[in-house]
């Protein structure tokens, strides 16, 4: 018996479906041309994102935070620095009881290799630590003359996330401790190239100037037309205290001989005011003693009356009659007014009866 062929279900061969006609091809040519123009307009109006032509290699991350007890101006300064530095990270305030070397562990947890730490003391003194975590070096500064962005209200402006230029005073290359600070400031304040949060623009410049043994920080906008500079802010002055070999500690590499602590400065001011007060009191005591001293009578000098001309003597008149009293017109008018008022009241009372 020959093997029978199995028939397909239904006994009919399955035919392939014809491809549907494209909807765009089905439209008339005029309508098709209008849709193409709309697509071109949408593509023209769309703003493309920043094109990254390289790889992000410099993985510098900066941790910016502070201790407890800072005032509003320090908090605003921290926010301004975080806004100007897209490669920065934030953290909660650190307790005063914790030691400074704990910050290295915080940087490790946050995956940061640089740190800007603001330390407040006595609710009036502000110190800034710039550190390369965890191996160092680190520098401690006293922050003075703080002016934030909201406080200055300058006319300059820059794009958020743009990369800055760094301008340093020529004095940074003259002394070794300034050269070390220059390298530390470059690694902290320069935004890495091709950073994900940065923009591929350079429209502002950070300037670090040395004057009066202090570092003055300024932020300027670069105007495209004539390359002029317009200040943006913030402003602050860094007074160097010490440079340490390690991160937040270790052997001292440099100590500023011109530095004067805020406590000593306030003490000098108090001593000057106290000296002025003591001087005033001594002057008053001397004046009192001079007043108590007996006055020395000088002998009469006959030459003092040479140019004195005696005045004519007036005859003395004796008044035997008592002068007439002066008439007070105001009192007289007042008495007449009272008399007339009483008479009017009597007449009115008589009419009523």
UniProtKB/Swiss-Prot annotation:
Subcellular location: Nucleus, Nucleolus
Assigned keywords, A-Z: Acetylation, Isopeptide bond, Nucleus, Phosphoprotein, Ribosome biogenesis, Ubl conjugation
The Brix domain, residue ranges: 60-249
Extent of Basic and acidic residues compositional bias: 21-36
Feature: compositional bias, Basic residues: 1-10
Pfam family of the protein (one): Brix
Residue(s) of cross-link: Glycyl lysine isopeptide (Lys-Gly) (interchain with G-Cter in SUMO2): 160, 314, 322
Biological process according to GO: ribosomal large subunit assembly; rRNA processing
GO function terms (MF aspect): RNA binding; rRNA binding
Residues that bear N6-acetyllysine: 276
Disordered, as annotated region: 1-46
InterPro entries for this protein: Brix, BRX1
Modified residues annotated as Phosphoserine in this record: 261
One GO CC annotation: nucleolus
Protein family: Belongs to the BRX1 family.
Function field: Required for biogenesis of the 60S ribosomal subunit.
Protein name as annotated: Ribosome biogenesis protein BRX1 homolog
Organism the protein comes from: Homo sapiens (Human)
Lineage, opening ranks: Eukaryota, Metazoa, Chordata, Craniata, Vertebrata
Gene this chain is encoded by: BRIX1
